[in-house]
Amino acid sequence: MKKLSKLLLALSFVLSVTTSAFAVTVVSWGGAYTESQKLGYGDPTAAKLGIPVNWVDYTGGLSEIKAQKEAGKITWDIIDVYAKDTIIGCDEGIFVEFDFDKDFSPAPGGTAASEDFFTGMPSKCAVGNILYSWNFAYNDATIGSKKPTKLKDFFDTKKFPGKRAVYKGAMSNLEIAITADGVNPGKGSDLTYRKLEADGGIDRAMGMFTKLCNDPNGGCVFWNAGAQPPELLANGEVVMATGWNGRFFNAQMEGTPLVQVWDGQILDYEYFAMVKGGPGDADGSAMKVLREMTSTEGLAGSAKYIAYAPWRKSSIAIMEAGEPWFKDGKTNMVPHMPTAPANTKRYILMNPDFWADNQDEINEKWEAMKAGL
């Protein structure tokens, strides 16, 4: 009997170690955003399914997961990615293709997932996570009596002298520049991308940043992590900063007197993709975790911690019924969503196909432009 008890004890120990060893690794952008994911649906999913969920930070792109696959040592399971990366990753066989309504849960009322998400996915390897904004902000305590209200003010160094914080990559910057230079987005932002694709369009947009960065009254500080723009504004290193609306919102909630300017915002989408051949792909744990995290309740949960809009219509309904939704129990979150009517009077809808088709050529030009500053 004692031998049997010892054997059972040893077996339970082995099983517990085995279970904990096969944690699902989710890769995201770090800072307040990853914290909102972890608290909003990562931890609840782990508790419900009994599958540990680990979070790893990265700075975007597919180079790291490609290196893992080439080395035959894949450690990532689920990656938070841009639309263009789901297209490229799907085409190159990096990500798993989904059977959408089978793999993802319906809304509480029974509506199929494909109908509950706001719009279709850019590839068969993508499931929507959040909708967010590339906009800009300023520090109300340091800006002076004149306040920026339009996107063109970001480039006006006569009216608003001082350095600007600018995203390190070309994506979003070209759309911002061409719009600030007088191009209205048009229906579905078609005009924005037609102007960029026209002869001289890319050079026209990049020229706006060349002028801004070389201006003695201006100057550029390039950022690569979402936490940087609010920090640069708070410490006075820049007078304005492009960034992600959720990061600016969190800084506001922490007491930094930032003001967001929504004119000309770029409404963008973020997606989850599952790595083909990852540790959690083999045993099915990654799909279980992904299904739970992207449920109605899961996506609504992240909006308790950051001002990014969940992809599901049913998630917004839960938020509206549960206001004040923010973690402080006092702040209504729906008005802070980038999709709120007051914030979408003039906006650009990110076109992932444009970037998937042109990013290599554009990025080469962009990096050459930065090197010449």
Residue ranges of predicted features:
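A ligand-binding cleft/hinge motif common to bilobed small-molecule-binding domains
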Residues: 86-88, 242-257
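Periplasmic-binding protein-like
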Residues: 132, 202-212, 255-276
